[in-house]
Amino acid sequence: MAVDPPKADPKGVAVDSSRRCPALGSREDQSAKAGGCCGSRDRVRRCIRANLLVLLTVAAVVAGVGLGLGVSAAGGADALGPARLTRFAFPGELLLRLLKMIILPLVVCSLIGGAASLDPSALGRVGAWALLFFLVTTLLASALGVGLALALKPGAAVTAITSINDSVVDPCARSAPTKEALDSFLDLVRNIFPSNLVSAAFRSFATSYEPKDNSCKIPQSCIQREINSTMVQLLCEVEGMNILGLVVFAIVFGVALRKLGPEGELLIRFFNSFNDATMVLVSWIMWYAPVGILFLVASKIVEMKDVRQLFISLGKYILCCLLGHAIHGLLVLPLIYFLFTRKNPYRFLWGIMTPLATAFGTSSSSATLPLMMKCVEEKNGVAKHISRFILPIGATVNMDGAALFQCVAAVFIAQLNGVSLDFVKIITILVTATASSVGAAGIPAGGVLTLAIILEAVSLPVKDISLILAVDWLVDRSCTVLNVEGDAFGAGLLQSYVDRTKMPSSEPELIQVKNEVSLNPLPLATEEGNPLLKQYQGPTGDSSATFEKESVM
């Protein structure tokens, strides 16, 4: 016998609802009234928390400029003295040392893991597209620099300047002739194939010329070749990491490990685990970056003896360089990115704001590389096997800012000396600047070292480089920002290309090595999911799959 459920008392329901509704209504009314205020506060708080590091870094740059100008107004370097100035710059020096400490393991391990995660055919396509992008953007930057310099005529505004910063130039370097373009090309090839990998971590090869009667000390390790009765060619190893040779070796070594098949999987996992641990160190260093950047910028401004007179004398040249970098970085590169990806380029730029500010503070593409890798992966969604393969290459060969600055400087020096540039000389400047920027080291003032090649190519006096050195502390920072921005946009474009073409990659297995992956014992050669084996499902899609080892030949 079915029992009817008890009926609810309508009065009780009415009473309960009358008791509850006012309270509920009051909460809704209160939340509606306070939602606009509290909700906006919460959004602002979350936004600040998510972008705290970016805001701190940008604020550090602004504070560094203000602090430097304030100390300069109070007497500057003369009032501080050499000892106090060194202590004043110590926090910035510490940041540079921390970043440079990370470069070597990061470049080698990331490139080995990235090259091992792509098939050789995919590796070739990605590398070819990257080099094409870097070449096109460098040519565009060079053309923009020449066009702006011809339009603004910065050299015509400079009068009665003979040696604004002679103290910066080494007196021994003034009398030495400049090496030829062929010597620079041969040095580039020598650095691609280092004779010693250990020494390549801190030394690179360079050719120079010295007079026979030069009183400057010549290192005993240099190979001397007599050119004529007055000149000697020196083949020496100079201080500075040979990052180009390390990049080439790491890529080739990664390809070789992939060709080994399962035998090389343990070593691939080792390099990927090493790289992941290095990125943890990078995340810690990033929180010290604002402090170091503040003192790097401030100390560099304090070192300049007369900033005001410098800007008055070379203001048009500085404006030409900074305007060119701004146009290329805020219009040209974002436009290329938008045309190929149909994504908002300025949202991409906001994601790499911390590395850009770090590049301005450190003035080194190589030192910014660890932070750039972390930001493009976490903020902009670039896959690890793309960023860790492309960004080290870009830090070596992609120098948009250097190419633009060199073209502006060449036209500036030509106008300063009253030399007219015809069409052939302009093309020579474009081609030489693009080619020489590839070999420019990713170190502070690396572009100035290759500027002499361009001046020699169009028969302009090399001695006027001393004018460029006077303001290089500012222009070189702008160059570095543009260089690393071009690297990041290149990684973003290649990520879009890989997504569209569905390029095969073993990245999830090889790059993202998690703790749950068992390293001992190693998976058998027939284990499912081995990225170095090709799996063929049976006709019915069952588990009876066959595996075939990838050929080493």
UniProtKB/Swiss-Prot annotation:
- Specify which residues bind Na(+) 2 according to the UniProt entry for this protein: 396
Task: Give binding positions for Na(+) 1.
Answer: 394, 398, 483, 487
User: Glycosylation: which residues?
Assistant: 165, 228
Q: What does this protein do?
A: Sodium-coupled antiporter of neutral amino acids. In a tri-substrate transport cycle, exchanges neutral amino acids between the extracellular and intracellular compartments, coupled to the inward cotransport of at least one sodium ion. The preferred substrate is the essential amino acid L-glutamine, a precursor for biosynthesis of proteins, nucleotides and amine sugars as well as an alternative fuel for mitochondrial oxidative phosphorylation. Exchanges L-glutamine with other neutral amino acids such as L-serine, L-threonine and L-asparagine in a bidirectional way.
The residue ranges crossing the membrane are 51-80, 94-115, 130-152, 237-260, 270-297, 319-340, 386-412, 473-494
The organism's lineage is: Eukaryota, Metazoa, Chordata, Craniata, Vertebrata
Q: Spans of biased composition, class Polar residues?
A: 537-546
InterPro entries from the UniProt entry: DAACS (IPR050746), Na-dicarboxylate_symporter (IPR001991), Na-dicarboxylate_symporter_CS (IPR018107), Na:dicarbo_symporter_sf (IPR036458)
Which residues are exposed on the Cytoplasmic face of the membrane?
1-50, 116-129, 261-269, 341-345, 377-385, 495-553
Query: Hey, what tissues is this thing expressed in?
Result: Highly expressed in adipose tissue. Detected in lung, skeletal muscle, large intestine, kidney and testis. Expressed in lung, brain, kidney and neural retina (at protein level). Expressed in Mueller cells (at protein level).
Disulphide bond pairs: none
Entry GO CC: basal plasma membrane; melanosome; membrane; plasma membrane
PROSITE patterns hit by this protein: NA_DICARBOXYL_SYMP_1, NA_DICARBOXYL_SYMP_2
Name the predominant localization.
Answer: membrane
Where does the UniProt annotation locate this protein? Cell membrane; Melanosome
Protein name as annotated = Neutral amino acid transporter B(0)
Instruction: Specify the inducers.
Output: Up-regulated during differentiation of preadipocytes into adipocytes upon treatment with a combination of glucocorticoids and INS.
Output the superkingdom of the source species: Eukaryota
How is this protein situated with respect to the membrane? Multi-pass membrane protein
